[in-house]
Design a protein with these regions (language model features):
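Hydrophobic helical h-region of N-terminal Sec-dependent signal peptides
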Residues: 10-16
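Bacterial N-terminal signal peptides that target proteins for export
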Residues: 1-10
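C-terminal motif of bacterial Sec signal peptides marking the signal peptidase cleavage site
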Residues: 18-21
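Conserved functional micro-motifs across diverse proteins
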Residues: 23-199
């Protein structure tokens, strides 16, 4: 039988408290950056701009997809976060989508070849608004995951990530000064099914 004295228990508790305090550098001039979830100003805009879902068939997740709408409101938050993290203006990071409707889409699928959104023989990508559906003018694979996963929580080593741009004006779908909420829908479809993401 093990006997614990109050002194031993107090020493053990104190050692745990001291050890848990060493989770970041104590050196002067060194600081860690907030992750996406800790940057409350950015995270709120990110959450409002991001939609996602799973395409499930016969109890199997075939695709897990998320899209972040590069609305003017979110784009401003992205630029501010980039200035905090990288101490530079990355306003031109997604220059292709600066005045157009653009999305960052992350997709995971069991087969690597099946998640190539730029392959129009396998995927149909549409932007639906009150003017009707349009196909993208740009589907560009993002390769710099190390940089962009600091901005998009759904990016991982297992996802394929794309910048998708449509020839439509970008709007803030939740802006309070709008008389009528604009229809903003991204549709991703292939032979297995489709997913519609609404803002």
């Amino acid at each position: 039988m093990i006997k614990f004295s109050m002194a031993k228990l107090a020493m053990f508790t104190l050692s745990l408290q001291l050890a848990s305090g060493c989770v970041s550098s104590m050196d002067r001039g060194i600081s860690t950056s907030d992750d996406i979830y800790s940057d409350s100003e950015y995270y709120e805009k990110y959450e409002n701009a991001t939609r996602g879902g799973d395409l499930i068939k016969k109890f199997e997740i075939l695709y897990r997809m998320h899209a972040t709408y590069l609305s003017p409101e979110f784009s401003n938050a992205l630029v501010k976060r980039a200035q905090k993290l990288y101490l530079e203006d990355t306003g031109g990071a997604f220059q292709e989508a600066s005045s157009k409707a653009g999305f960052i889409v992350t997709i995971y699928g069991l087969e690597r070849e099946s998640v190539d959104l730029s392959n129009t023989a396998h995927w149909t990508v549409l932007f639906e608004s009150k003017e009707g559906p349009v196909k993208p003018i740009l589907v560009k694979k993002l390769n710099d995951k190390i940089r962009w996963r600091n901005f998009f929580a759904t990016m991982s080593p297992w996802t394929s990530d794309y910048l998708i741009v449509f020839d439509r004006a970008a709007v803030n779908p939740s802006a309070s000064n709008l008389v009528e909420k604009p229809k903003t829908r991204l549709v991703l479809a292939n032979g297995d099914g489709k997913i519609q993401l609404d803002w």
